[in-house]
């Protein structure tokens, strides 16, 4: 009766098998070396992968057409590494409210948009432009508000400076003094 035992070796690609006989001494001690490569294959690769990762079978990520290929490496991600603003035609507004559908059936123009004054009354931009042309004392008497309020709203009728993008904007931190200059 003989036993077979596998002896670990230093190389990963070969194994040693040594035959040992029982208490009966034999003159020929032979060592058989078997070398080869063992390749294991799963029956269905996707099922084996899902079980290893702990996910349910049949559950896969499916990317939609609008998912960005970050950095052009063929790796899709739902997180975008850059903030991209699509260029707009010259006459088109850049505000996000123009992109969404409005709930009212009437189109809004700049002159029809309501502004609330300090007393809570709604006024149109057209009225604010008229207020800006009046003297400060007349505006205060006519509307019951300070002249600085009207001046501030009159500036809205003109072109405004473009706001910085998300990378240029510094977050406001409460309780810490603002640093000036870089």
Swiss-Prot record:
Subcellular location: Nucleus
InterPro entries: PPI_Ypi1
Keyword Zinc: no
Chain intervals with Basic and acidic residues compositional bias: 113-128
Biased composition (Polar residues): 1-18, 129-149
Location of region: Disordered: 1-30, 76-182
Ranges annotated as biased composition (Basic residues): 150-162
Gene Ontology CC entries for this record: nucleus
Gene Ontology MF term list: protein phosphatase 1 binding; protein serine/threonine phosphatase inhibitor activity
Keyword terms of this UniProt record: Nucleus
Role according to the record: Regulator of type 1 phosphatases which maintains protein phosphatase activity under strict control.
Family listed: Belongs to the YPI1 family.
Protein name as it appears in the record: Type 1 phosphatases regulator ypi1
Organism phylogeny: Eukaryota, Fungi, Dikarya, Ascomycota, Pezizomycotina
Gene: ypi1
């Amino acid at each position: 009766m003989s036993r077979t035992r596998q002896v670990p070796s230093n190389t990963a690609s070969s194994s040693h098998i040594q035959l040992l006989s029982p208490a009966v001494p034999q003159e020929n001690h032979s060592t058989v070396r078997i070398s080869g490569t063992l390749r294991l294959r799963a029956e269905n690769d996707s099922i084996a992968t899902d079980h290893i990762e702990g996910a349910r079978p049949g559950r896969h990520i499916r990317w939609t057409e609008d998912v960005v290929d970050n950095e052009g490496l063929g790796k899709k991600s739902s997180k975008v590494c850059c903030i991209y603003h699509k260029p707009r035609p010259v006459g088109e507004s850049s505000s996000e409210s123009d992109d969404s559908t409005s709930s009212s059936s009437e189109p809004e123009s700049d002159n029809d948009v309501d502004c609330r004054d300090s007393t809570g009354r709604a006024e149109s931009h057209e009225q604010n432009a008229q207020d800006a042309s009046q003297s400060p004392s007349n505006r205060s008497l006519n509307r019951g508000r300070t002249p600085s309020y009207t001046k501030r709203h009159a500036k809205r009728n003109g072109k405004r400076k473009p706001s910085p993008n998300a990378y240029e904007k510094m977050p406001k931190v409460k309780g810490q003094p603002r640093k000036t200059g870089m």
